């Protein structure tokens, strides 16, 4: 049975791997010249299995108003003429209640913890290396209010059996010795089972392993639309040619909604623009041990072999990929405060990418109203974290095997009207430029 996977980021590539392992004939199609050249290219590098939280959280609407006037705000909204932007923001606001936050976080933790197990199993099986570290995540709190607010997160972590530690200043320094000079840290939440790693390196190496296993990758291919007969997808237009298969997987990140919209599906995935800096380490003793998350700025500082990756922030600004000097200054501010002697900022590489976010934070994985069309998208800032679990979960669904975790709330049908039957048949679409 032939499957076309549309997209060669970390989500598309892990999907291809697990589908091939399940016995499918797999072809991956992408318009880039190679794998992991967009959102997966230079993300923060966190494998945040325990630190998994939706942006839609209690208190965020009030904070967002204040952030409008802050230079280094973690969230920025740039209103435009895009109705999808306003629809997505409204849905996000509706998820900023304690009840919805608990439901959404529980779903995300379920997938993230499963993904940790899948990644560990994959590493043991095929020995893939990606500058990974298994030394945990430390979430830094600069105010007592931030520390107190972590109580709800801790409750959900305990519910799912996720190990954690609440650290005082001495505990922070023990976990991350280079932070001994930093003043004003009131505490931290440490998640010892979290990991780090270079997402692009992982994806490139897994893609090669996919090829060795019989997966075909076709790059520099423009995907311009799906064609259906009302019940099934009959093909996808690629470089002006109709490509056919038995099943189709859409793993195009923020560009997924444009592909399925002409089929009558309104997929609530919107790009959250993020930024990163990658700088060479100058003094290993003054660099991070693993991953630090600065709660005030929502910025992560991650250690690779000989590099530091600083990433974070979220801009609701459509498909704009321009680089913002202000955002660079925020990243430089955080790494200079925490690790002033750890790396060389003068040699830093600045990058931006679009994370495909849902308003509730949970990805969209699984079946659609079309019997042979599947989605694997909407992971937001956690695509790297959830990639292996999402790929394995999808392969199990498509193989009619019982997934190892609950399927509750993971597919598009949780949005009600967004899972309705298609209104138009045999239509195509044109994706936004990227």
From Swiss-Prot:
Catalytic activity: a D-alpha-amino acid + A + H2O = a 2-oxocarboxylate + AH2 + NH4(+)
Keyword Oxidoreductase belongs to the record: yes
Cofactors demanded by this protein: FAD
Binding positions (FAD): 3-17
GO cellular component, one term: cytoplasm
Enzyme Commission (EC) number: 1.4.99.-
Record family assignment: Belongs to the DadA oxidoreductase family.
Name the record gives this protein: D-amino acid dehydrogenase
Organism annotation: Stenotrophomonas maltophilia (strain R551-3)
């Amino acid at each position: 049975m032939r499957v076309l996977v549309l997209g060669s980021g970390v989500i598309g590539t892990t999907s291809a791997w697990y589908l091939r392992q399940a016995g499918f004939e797999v072809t991956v199609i992408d318009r880039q010249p190679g794998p992991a050249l967009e959102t997966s290219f230079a993300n923060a590098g966190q494998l945040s299995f325990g630190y998994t939280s939706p942006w839609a959280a209690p208190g965020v609407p009030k904070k967002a108003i204040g952030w409008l006037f802050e230079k280094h705000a973690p969230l920025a909204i740039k209103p435009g003429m895009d109705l999808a932007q306003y629809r997505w923001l409204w849905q996000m606001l509706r998820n900023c209640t304690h009840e919805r936050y608990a439901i959404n976080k529980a779903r995300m933790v379920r997938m993230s913890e499963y993904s940790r197990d899948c990644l560990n199993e994959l590493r043991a099986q095929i020995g893939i290396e990606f500058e990974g570290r298994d030394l945990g995540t430390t979430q830094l709190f600069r105010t007592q209010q931030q520390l107190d607010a972590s109580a709800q997160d801790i409750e959900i972590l305990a519910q799912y059996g996720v190990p954690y530690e609440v650290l005082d200043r001495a505990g922070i320094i023990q976990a991350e010795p280079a932070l001994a000079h930093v003043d004003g840290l009131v505490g931290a939440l440490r998640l010892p089972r979290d990991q780090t790693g270079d997402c692009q390196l992982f994806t490139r190496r897994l893609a090669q392993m996919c090829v060795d296993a019989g997966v075909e990758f076709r790059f520099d291919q423009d995907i311009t639309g799906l064609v259906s007969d009302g019940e099934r997808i009959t093909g996808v237009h690629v470089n002006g040619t109709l490509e056919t298969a038995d099943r189709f997987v859409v793993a195009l990140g923020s560009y997924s909604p444009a592909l399925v919209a002409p089929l009558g599906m309104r997929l609530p995935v919107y790009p959250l623009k993020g930024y990163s800096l990658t700088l060479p380490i100058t003094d290993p003793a003054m660099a991070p041990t693993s991953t630090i998350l600065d709660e005030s700025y929502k910025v992560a500082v991650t250690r690779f072999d000989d590099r530091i990756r600083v990433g974070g922030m979220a801009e609701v600004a459509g498909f704009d990929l321009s680089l913002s000097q202000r955002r660079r200054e925020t990243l430089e501010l955080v790494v200079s405060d925490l690790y002033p002697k750890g790396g060389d900022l003068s040699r830093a590489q600045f990058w931006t990418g679009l994370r495909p976010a849902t308003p509730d934070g949970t990805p969209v994985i699984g079946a659609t109203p079309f019997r042979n069309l599947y989605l694997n998208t909407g992971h937001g800032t956690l695509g790297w974290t959830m990639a292996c679990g999402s790929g394995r979960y999808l392969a199990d669904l498509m193989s009619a095997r019982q997934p190892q975790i609950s399927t509750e709330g993971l597919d598009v049908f949780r949005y009600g009207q967004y899972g309705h039957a298609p209104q138009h048949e045999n239509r195509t679409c044109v994706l936004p430029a990227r």
